[in-house]
Amino acid sequence: GIEYCKNLINLECDFNAITSLDLSGLDKLEYVDCSYNLIKTANLSGCISLKQLYANVNEIGALNLKECANLQLVQAYKNKLTACDVSGMSKLVYLDVSQNQLTTLNISNCSEMLIVNCGSNKLAALDLSGLEKLTSLGCYNNNLTTLDTSKLPEMSFLECYANSLTTLDLTTNSKIATLHCQNNLLKTLKIETCQNLTSINCSQNSLEGELDLSSRTELRKIDCGNTFLTKLNLTDCTKIETLNCNNANFSELDVTGQPAMTELNCRDNTLTTLDVSNNLNLETLYCQGNPLTKLWLAEGQSISTLVIDNPDAIDYK
């Protein structure tokens, strides 16, 4: 058997019908790809040189990685893991255990960790302490009610959508560029210091009042629809390309300073006037479900898709 291959360094056995994998004692093994099999049990004890593990799309129920202290990358998405403990693994940089059945995940004190994806599990809590270098976190589609990112100063990518979060405070995460926090229970979203945003989706939440995105000069995509927001501040956001603010409580919407915008969905609000005459790149406009009395367009402006309840409201500047 493979246990006698004591000098084995690389093992690629992906896309087979393997049901169990015993690599115990292979202390020179550095690379394993056993993805797309039927593996239920995997023994990696004594694999002290292992650096990269790809075990995606199997049926693995438990994975003990504690003896693999040199691991740098672990991919084990789409398995049947219920728990995963990689705490204190100081060389681990990348971890993807998404699409499992995890109820516990211990990733604390992985001092070199850059990327974690633990989305689509059953996590009710997530300890992010000791991950000061983390740049990307995917914890979407879990059972999280709180998320403390205060000790992640380098984080630029966060996907925490489809949880039960009521508050998200990103005050200390000033490098955030991509934020997807839709489909939660958010009433509070603190992003005042997040001036590097390029994409934000905070739709399907309980947000009220004003969403102030002013001075986000690199912001290109916004989705704040299906909320209770009443005001949107886009001052100096000149690079916005798509804006979705449908089904909110906006009675006014100023997009005159967004010349790069190609798509606007503001349907189902309480807008009475809308001026898109400065949005000469606009290709798609959904503004139905508003009591519009005036929609301002520019002379000769060409919008390929325009949906409006009252075409008589259209006028030209």
Predicted regions mapped to residue ranges:
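Ser/Thr/Pro-rich low-complexity tandem-repeat tracts
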Residues: 13, 24, 35, 45, ...
